[in-house]
């Protein structure tokens, strides 16, 4: 509709929602010079961590590094508020290693609010957004069929619950679990986006009127228990092992407070039996809701049903902050009634006398299947309307933050009449995630995983700055100070790699005998330091041990040099694969191609490609329902057709 009301205020970009996606979107837009407003239901819950107060983990830490490399904030705040840091998969290859930080959730939210309040061009407003102001294109007003993907109009602003109108040239929706949010404990439920906070009303209905398809998903969070009532001395202690590692590439953010321990307990036979006896009382198994939950973060009842052969599951007790006794019981989310939850907690070793401060609950909410979005995160139906975070069907603060940055960036570029930026899946986990979201028909909350990327050896966390900071600088997301820091680091890396390629160890050197004595591997003749570093059991720290370094260099430079040299062959092969893929994606497909005649394609791919008639192999890759196997089949078909043409041409020449 075209509003007849006067606008309370006008902005270039409005962001709806103050979670991790919304904060990144608003900050990105404002830092690009756009007059930006962030609307949130509750100013006291900005960037709240309603579930696990932690940042990072496999693939998630890579996302955080990438967001930081593009000027985002999540990595800096995770470093600033970290209670504990650990490197996961430390014994495995660099492609799957991950940094994870337990954070102080209240401090994290407080620091984010301070940043938002002190960012030029950014205003914050507390209000419930219930409607969108749209100007329809001529003859498009009644076109509300979800299957029709062409644009029907463009965004003009938003409307709040109490009737205020705010105009904007672009709007980013980052509503999290608040659209139609309903929390469940057993068979009891109430309208809420999360415990203690009201759900958002009206916006889902508005989106449906505009022709968007919406659906429902669910997630859950475990109980919080009082640290003072847990026998921590009887449990295994998990210490921090990475206080010297950071998410951010900015040295000004390299701060670590006193580290806190986590503790480990396990479920028991009593735990499992109590759950089995009461499955019918949970929202899912009792049939009260049927929304899909996150596959990779299952409830404890899901674990016991799905892994019936296991008689115990590991549970982590994690602090929520320095100034609170609350402990997060990781791996123990449940939908059981509140009166059974304390009994269940007390079956865990060390928690026999625990006090439950907050019960576990499940939350069900509306989302927009992301196939209705462009790869820029702009909606296909409404120009200037963007969507990011859990509203797109993802789960996790890291996934939300990355989408928020992309949506905020592209909303700002739209206002400035610039072309949107698409992150390719081979260039970043951000690109991998968005490509998956907008091209695949996902039916459960999406979590980024290293296994989702075909190029994970290249898309590591340690080189996110090398991959993305030049782009960030070009786009105006990285300032001169950060750019100078980046260039100085690259110079150090290159200089050290050149040195290691030139300098050699000789069999007669004193250190050669020390190396043989400690490793059992002799130095024969002479060997470049680079080739020495390529040995399986040798790391950069060994160069320091054997006095084979000329200067002290930062830890991040050491790691970059070691990975570049040790995995050079693999990296070159993967780069070649990416270049080949880029060339293949440019291959044109014939007009009006009858895909039903290509028997090697899946039935779904034939149907989807027949309708969409993509111009190239790259465009075919963007069609929902077309798999990698289908693309390979198309590539083979193109090669066969090319060979047939050559044969026909040769045959004609012989005939003539």
Swiss-Prot record:
Q: Which GO BP terms, alphabetically?
A: tRNA methylation; tRNA wobble uridine modification
**Native organism:** Prochlorococcus marinus (strain NATL1A)
Q: What is this protein called?
A: tRNA uridine 5-carboxymethylaminomethyl modification enzyme MnmG
Chain's role: NAD-binding protein involved in the addition of a carboxymethylaminomethyl (cmnm) group at the wobble position (U34) of certain tRNAs, forming tRNA-cmnm(5)s(2)U34.
Among InterPro entries, the record links this protein to:
FAD/NAD-bd_sf, GIDA_C_N, MnmG, MnmG-rel, MnmG-rel_CS, MnmG_C, MnmG_C_subdom, MnmG_C_subdom_sf
Q: Which residues are NAD(+)-binding?
A: 293-307
Per the record's keyword annotation, is tRNA processing included, yes or no? yes
Main location (coarse class)? cytoplasm
Q: Which GO terms describe its molecular function?
A: flavin adenine dinucleotide binding
Q: Which PANTHER family match?
A: GLUCOSE INHIBITED DIVISION PROTEIN A, PROTEIN MTO1 HOMOLOG, MITOCHONDRIAL
Pfam families under this entry? GIDA, GIDA_C_1st, SAM_GIDA_C
Q: What does the organism's lineage look like at the top? A: Bacteria, Bacillati, Cyanobacteriota, Cyanophyceae, Synechococcales
| Keyword DNA repair part of the UniProt annotation | no
Q: Where does FAD bind?
A: 17-22, 129, 200, 390
Relate the assembly described in the record. Answer: Homodimer. Heterotetramer of two MnmE and two MnmG subunits.
Which compartments does it reside in?
Cytoplasm
Q: Which cofactor does it need?
A: FAD
Q: Which family does it belong to?
A: Belongs to the MnmG family.
Q: Mind naming one GO cellular-component term on file for this protein?
A: cytoplasm
